[in-house]
Amino acid sequence: WIIPFIPLPVPILIGAGLILFPTATKSFRRMWAFQSVLLLSIVMIFSIYLSIQQINSSSFSQYVWSWIINNDFSLDFGYLIDPLTSIMXXLITTVGIMVLIYSDNYMAHDQGYLRFFAYMSFFSTSMLGLVTSSNLIQIYIFWELVGLCSYLLIGFWFTRPVAANACQKAFVTNRVGDFGLLLGILGFYWITGSFEFRDLFEIFNNLIYNNEVNFLFVTLCAVLLFVGAVAKSAQFPLHVWLPDAMEGPTPISALIHAATMVAAGIFLVARLLPLFRVIPYIMYLISIIGIITVLLGATLALAQKDIKRGLAYSTMSQLGYMMLALGMGSYRSALFHLITHAYSKALLFLGSGSIIHSMETIVGYSPAKSQNMGLMGGLRKHVPITKITFLLGTLSLCGIPPLACFWSKDEILNDSWLYSPIFAIIAWATAGLTAFYMFRIYLLTFEGHLNVHFQNYGGKHKTPFYSISLWGKNGIKKNSCLLTMNNNESTYFFSKTKYPIDKNERKMTRPFMTIAHFERKAVYSYPYESDNTMLFPIFVLGLFTLFVGSIGIPFNQDGVNLDILSKWLAPSINLLHQKSNNSMDWNEFLKDAVLSVSIAYFGIFIASFLYKPIYSSLKNLELINFFVKKGPKRILWDKIINGIYDWSYNRAYIDAFYTRFLVGGIRGLAEFTHFFDRRVIDGMTNGVGVISFIV
C-alpha cells in the first residue's frame, strides 16, 4: 500500500518550500531532483521484487480497508497486486526514472524547474495509485488525478497561448470520457452492488449465467466504461487532444506516451476484460475502435512536419494495436506490446528532445522552428549517439527483428488472422505504413544536409528542399534540372545564391560536460551532441529496446520453459479462462515473420526512395525520371497524392469538424443562455422591481 505514496513527499515539500522559504528552496533545487529520482528508485526496487514474486509464485495479493457508512453501504480502500499491477508498476518506475534523470539537464535553464519536478512526482504517485487500486472508486479518484497532472504538465508553459489552449483541449476531451466512466461505474454498482473487482466479476458472471440482467442496460454501462478508456488512450474519436499535448516539455511527452496517461486507458480495459469478455458486443466494439485507430493514426502521421507530432500519431496507432488485441481477447499480446512499445517510444521521444535541444542553439527557443523537420537534416554528423539510438527505436517500431516491438506486434498480427481477415489485412498494411512514416521522420532528421542554413525565417523558400510533403522534397518538380542530365546542362542541387552564416555564429567549441546553472555564452553554427545526463537515459532505454522483447519469446522447447511473460501473466490468463499457448510452431512463426518483415522493409524502401536526399544518390536519376513523366496519368496521380497529403496534414479534418459543429454549437448555446438569463430572467425581475418602485 505504501508504493503510490513514496514519491508524494517531493511535491508536498517543494510546494511548502516555495511558499515558506522560496530563496532557499530554489538555491537547493538540484537536491529536489535527486530526491525525486531516489524515491522513485525505491518504488522501482519494490516493483521488481513484486514482479519476481509474481513470476515465481503466480499469485494474487489483495488487502482492503472497509469504511462503513451505514449497514447498507460501505466504501472499501485497498490495494491489488497481480501480474497486471506489477507490469505497470515496473513500466512506470523504470521509464519515470530515466525521464527524471534526463529532465535534470533538459529543464536546467527553465524558470519552472522545481514546479516541473513537483508535477512529475505527483504524476508518478497518481499513476502508481491507479494501477494498485482494488476497486472502481479508487480507480476513478486516481484517474482524475492523472488527468489533472496531464493538464498541468501539457500547459507547463502556460504563458504561451498555444500551450494554454492545448492543456484545456486535453482536459475537456478527457472530461467527456471521464463522465462516461463515472456513469458506467455507477451503472455496474447498481447491477452488482459492489465496486471491488473480484466481487464485481464473480457477481456479474453469475447474473449473466442465470440470465438475470437486462443486456441492453449492461451493454450501455460497458460502453460508458469503455468511453473513459477511449479518451485517455487517445482512441478514435476522442484522439484529438494527443497531438496538441506536444506543447508541453519533451520529457513530459515521453512519460505520457510511454508509461502513464495513454497507458491508463489500456490498463483499464485490461483490468475490466473479465467483465467485457462476457458481453460480446463490447468486445466487437473494442476491436473496431482499435482497428480504426490503428489506420487513422498511421495515415495522420504521414505528413506531419513537427517531429513530436509525428511521434504522437505513431503512439495513437500503436495504442490502437493494443486495443485491437484486447478486443480480440489476446490479453498476453496486448500487454506484451504495451511493454515493448513503452521503452521504444520513450527512447524516441527522449531522442527527439535531444535533437530539439541541439537545434534550439541555432534557430532559437521556438517550437515552430526547433521541432520542424524541414529545418533539420544531416544531423547524423552532429549528434551521432542520438542518431544511433533513434535509429534503434525507429527499427523497433517498424517491427525489424530482433528488436522489442517485432515480437509483440507479430503476435498481434498473427492473432488478427484468426479473428477477422479484414482486420488482419488492415493491421498488416498499417505495419507497412508504420515503417514508412517512421523512416520518413528518421531520413528528414538525420540524412542529407542541415537545411537551417539555407532558410530564411520570413516564409520564403531559398531551396527546393525546404517544404515537406508526402513525396518528400515538396514533390518532384517536372521542370527541375535534376531530372535532365544533358551534356550542355549543369546539374546543381542547391540554390546558387550563397547565404552567409550569421556573424555572431562561430565554430562549435564546447566541453563535453556543461554546468547546468550557467547560460551558454556561445552561439553555435551547427547542432551538438547532448550532455551525458541526457545521453545516459537514452542509452539505457536503447538497451531495453534491444533486449526487453526476449521476455515474451516462448523458448520452451524440449521441456525447458523460458517464457517469462507467460509465467508472469499466468494468474490473469487463468482468471480469463484462457488456455495459455506456451508452445510455438517455429515453422509457422518464421513464415509469418518473413511476411511482416517484408512489409516493413517495403515501407522503408518507399520512404528511402521518396525522402532520401536526391543529391546523395545521383545514380537513381533515371529511376526518378521514370516516375516523373508528364501526361494525364501523372496529373491524376499528383492530385491523388496532394489529396492524401492535405487530408493527413489537416488531421483528416476531424479537428475542424469538432471546432465548427461541436465547439461552435456549444458556444452558441452558451451565448444564447447568457442572453436569456441577462435579458429575459433578469429583465423580468428588474421590471417587477421598477414597477413596484413606480407604484
Curated annotation (Swiss-Prot):
<comment type="function">
    <text>NDH shuttles electrons from NAD(P)H:plastoquinone, via FMN and iron-sulfur (Fe-S) centers, to quinones in the photosynthetic chain and possibly in a chloroplast respiratory chain. The immediate electron acceptor for the enzyme in this species is believed to be plastoquinone. Couples the redox reaction to proton translocation, and thus conserves the redox energy in a proton gradient.</text>
</comment>
<dbReference type="GO" id="GO:0008137">
    <property type="term" value="F:NADH dehydrogenase (ubiquinone) activity"/>
</dbReference>
<keyword id="KW-0472">Membrane</keyword>
<feature type="transmembrane region" description="Helical">
    <location>
        <begin position="346"/>
        <end position="366"/>
    </location>
</feature>
<feature type="transmembrane region" description="Helical">
    <location>
        <begin position="417"/>
        <end position="437"/>
    </location>
</feature>
<dbReference type="Pfam" id="PF00361">
    <property type="entry name" value="Proton_antipo_M"/>
</dbReference>
<feature type="transmembrane region" description="Helical">
    <location>
        <begin position="388"/>
        <end position="408"/>
    </location>
</feature>
<keyword id="KW-0520">NAD</keyword>
<dbReference type="GO" id="GO:0048038">
    <property type="term" value="F:quinone binding"/>
</dbReference>
<feature type="transmembrane region" description="Helical">
    <location>
        <begin position="535"/>
        <end position="555"/>
    </location>
</feature>
<dbReference type="GO" id="GO:0009535">
    <property type="term" value="C:chloroplast thylakoid membrane"/>
</dbReference>
<dbReference type="Pfam" id="PF00662">
    <property type="entry name" value="Proton_antipo_N"/>
</dbReference>
<keyword id="KW-0813">Transport</keyword>
<comment type="subunit">
    <text>NDH is composed of at least 16 different subunits, 5 of which are encoded in the nucleus.</text>
</comment>
<keyword id="KW-1278">Translocase</keyword>
<feature type="transmembrane region" description="Helical">
    <location>
        <begin position="319"/>
        <end position="339"/>
    </location>
</feature>
<dbReference type="GO" id="GO:0042773">
    <property type="term" value="P:ATP synthesis coupled electron transport"/>
</dbReference>
<keyword id="KW-0934">Plastid</keyword>
<dbReference type="InterPro" id="IPR003945">
    <property type="entry name" value="NU5C-like"/>
</dbReference>
<dbReference type="InterPro" id="IPR002128">
    <property type="entry name" value="NADH_UbQ_OxRdtase_chlpt_su5_C"/>
</dbReference>
<feature type="transmembrane region" description="Helical">
    <location>
        <begin position="211"/>
        <end position="231"/>
    </location>
</feature>
<protein>
    <recommendedName>
        <fullName>NAD(P)H-quinone oxidoreductase subunit 5, chloroplastic</fullName>
        <ecNumber>7.1.1.-</ecNumber>
    </recommendedName>
</protein>
<keyword id="KW-1133">Transmembrane helix</keyword>
<feature type="transmembrane region" description="Helical">
    <location>
        <begin position="81"/>
        <end position="101"/>
    </location>
</feature>
<dbReference type="InterPro" id="IPR001750">
    <property type="entry name" value="ND/Mrp_TM"/>
</dbReference>
<comment type="similarity">
    <text>Belongs to the complex I subunit 5 family.</text>
</comment>
<dbReference type="Pfam" id="PF01010">
    <property type="entry name" value="Proton_antipo_C"/>
</dbReference>
<dbReference type="GO" id="GO:0015990">
    <property type="term" value="P:electron transport coupled proton transport"/>
</dbReference>
<feature type="transmembrane region" description="Helical">
    <location>
        <begin position="32"/>
        <end position="52"/>
    </location>
</feature>
<keyword id="KW-0812">Transmembrane</keyword>
<dbReference type="InterPro" id="IPR001516">
    <property type="entry name" value="Proton_antipo_N"/>
</dbReference>
<keyword id="KW-0150">Chloroplast</keyword>
<feature type="transmembrane region" description="Helical">
    <location>
        <begin position="250"/>
        <end position="270"/>
    </location>
</feature>
<keyword id="KW-0618">Plastoquinone</keyword>
<feature type="transmembrane region" description="Helical">
    <location>
        <begin position="139"/>
        <end position="159"/>
    </location>
</feature>
<dbReference type="InterPro" id="IPR018393">
    <property type="entry name" value="NADHpl_OxRdtase_5_subgr"/>
</dbReference>
<feature type="transmembrane region" description="Helical">
    <location>
        <begin position="1"/>
        <end position="21"/>
    </location>
</feature>
<keyword id="KW-0874">Quinone</keyword>
<feature type="transmembrane region" description="Helical">
    <location>
        <begin position="177"/>
        <end position="197"/>
    </location>
</feature>
<keyword id="KW-0521">NADP</keyword>
<feature type="transmembrane region" description="Helical">
    <location>
        <begin position="117"/>
        <end position="137"/>
    </location>
</feature>
<feature type="transmembrane region" description="Helical">
    <location>
        <begin position="278"/>
        <end position="298"/>
    </location>
</feature>
